[in-house]
């Protein structure tokens, strides 16, 4: 029995199978989860997550400045810094020859 071109021993057309596989794989990826996923809902969730991330970043950035605000008097700190600088200047004058 002569072997026919492009056919397997069982008589299956290899070209036909290749075409079917190519068609199936081309369409399969987009529709595999199509019934399970609402694209609009996912986009909305992604936008909400991005907004929350931005909000959290802003909140933590602002939080650093206000974390100790109730405990620290800026005027008092300036006064202490001025006193420390004055003492430093006095001490450096004593030891110069």
UniProtKB/Swiss-Prot annotation:
Tell me where on the tree of life, at the top rank, the source sits: Bacteria
GO biological process assignments: sporulation resulting in formation of a cellular spore
Record's compositionally biased regions (Low complexity): 43-63, 79-91
InterPro entries according to UniProt: Spore_gamma (IPR006341)
Q: Where is this region: Disordered?
A: 1-97
Bias-annotated ranges (Polar residues):
1-42, 69-78
Which keywords fit this entry according to its UniProt record? Repeat, Sporulation
- What Pfam families does the record tag this protein with? SASP_gamma (PF04259)
Repeat listed as a keyword: yes
At which residues is there a site annotated Cleavage?
32-33, 67-68
Query: Carries keyword Repeat?
Result: yes
Annotated sequence repeats reside at 23-56, 58-91
Q: Which family does it belong to?
A: Belongs to the gamma-type SASP family.
Function as written in the Swiss-Prot or TrEMBL entry: SASP are proteins degraded in the first minutes of spore germination and provide amino acids for both new protein synthesis and metabolism. These proteins may be involved in dormant spore's high resistance to UV light.
Q: Which NCBIfam families match?
A: SASP_gamma
UniProt name for this protein: Small, acid-soluble spore protein gamma-type
Q: Which organism is it from?
A: Priestia megaterium
Q: What high-level taxonomic lineage is stated for the organism?
A: Bacteria, Bacillati, Bacillota, Bacilli, Bacillales
């Amino acid at each position: 029995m002569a072997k026919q071109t492009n056919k397997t021993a069982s008589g299956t057309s290899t070209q036909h199978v290749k075409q079917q596989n190519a068609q199936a794989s081309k369409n399969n990826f987009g529709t595999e989860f199509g019934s399970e996923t609402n694209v609009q809902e996912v986009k909305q969730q992604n936008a909400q997550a991005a907004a929350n991330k931005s909000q959290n970043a802003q909140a933590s950035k602002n939080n650093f400045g206000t974390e100790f605000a109730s405990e620290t008097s800026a005027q008092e700190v300036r006064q202490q810094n001025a006193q420390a600088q004055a003492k430093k200047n006095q001490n450096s004058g004593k030891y110069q020859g």
